């Protein structure tokens, strides 16, 4: 069981690192923060607590994906739709 959790944690770290490439404050900032969070929890041994932390990490992944999707949507909307409420 410990090996499966370890693999899951490593996979989560790898996926978060990949998603952090486009983080608004920069990839270096994201990588540093991610590493600090994982190092802070490296001594957790309780499988239930580890599962809880993994779920929190998955939630963060979903939030990042939503952030990127929204940013792309806003950029496309700005390019293709003019704001009719603007006054000149």
UniProtKB/Swiss-Prot annotation:
The gene is ETFRF1. It is found in: Mitochondrion. GO terms for biological process: negative regulation of oxidative phosphorylation; respiratory electron transport chain. Transmembrane segments: none annotated. This is Electron transfer flavoprotein regulatory factor 1. Acts as a regulator of the electron transfer flavoprotein by promoting the removal of flavin from the ETF holoenzyme (composed of ETFA and ETFB). GO terms for cellular component: mitochondrion. Belongs to the complex I LYR family.
């Amino acid at each position: 069981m410990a090996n499966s959790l370890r693999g899951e944690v490593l996979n989560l770290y790898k996926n978060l690192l990949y998603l952090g490439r486009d983080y608004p404050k920069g990839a270096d900032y994201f990588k540093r923060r991610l590493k600090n969070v994982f190092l802070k929890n490296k001594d957790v041994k309780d499988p239930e607590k580890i599962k809880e932390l993994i779920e929190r990490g998955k939630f963060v992944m979903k939030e990042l994906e939503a952030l990127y999707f929204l940013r792309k949507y806003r950029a496309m909307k700005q390019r293709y739709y003019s704001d009719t409420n603007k006054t000149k």
